[in-house]
């Protein structure tokens, strides 16, 4: 008898969990654009931030490359002058 009540309690919990999942899925499906808009907004924001960081990085990269070339040329010409 005790085993039967345990099995029935487990079945009730499973049924309650399944009903909760169905209601949750139904309410999520009621707003079809909600998830899509959040994902789209997040990706757009990430893309904007990446473009901003890249545009801020280019001046630094060019400065480092030009400085490296100037140092290399200075070393080359200073060693020939001596």
From Swiss-Prot:
Protein family per UniProt: Belongs to the inovirus capsid protein family.
Gene3D superfamilies (UniProt xref): 1.20.5.80
Domain of life of the organism encoding this protein: Viruses
Membrane topology qualifier: Single-pass type I membrane protein
Residues on Cytoplasmic side: 75-82
Pfam families: Phage_coatGP8
Transmembrane segments: 55-74
Primary location: virion
One GO term describing the cellular component: host cell membrane
Function: Self assembles to form a helical capsid wrapping up the viral genomic DNA. The capsid displays a filamentous structure with a length of 760-1950 nm and a width of 6-8 nm. The virion assembly and budding take place at the host inner membrane.
Organism: Salmonella phage IKe (Bacteriophage IKe)
Topological region Periplasmic: 30-54
Signal peptide interval: 1-29
Cross-referenced InterPro entries: G8P (IPR008020), Phage_M13_G8P_capsid_dom_sf (IPR023390)
Protein name according to UniProt: Capsid protein G8P
Subcellular location: Virion; Host membrane
Subunit and partners: Homomultimerizes. There are several thousands of this protein in the phage capsid.
Keywords carried by this UniProt record: Capsid protein, Helical capsid protein, Host membrane, Membrane, Signal, Transmembrane, Transmembrane helix, Virion
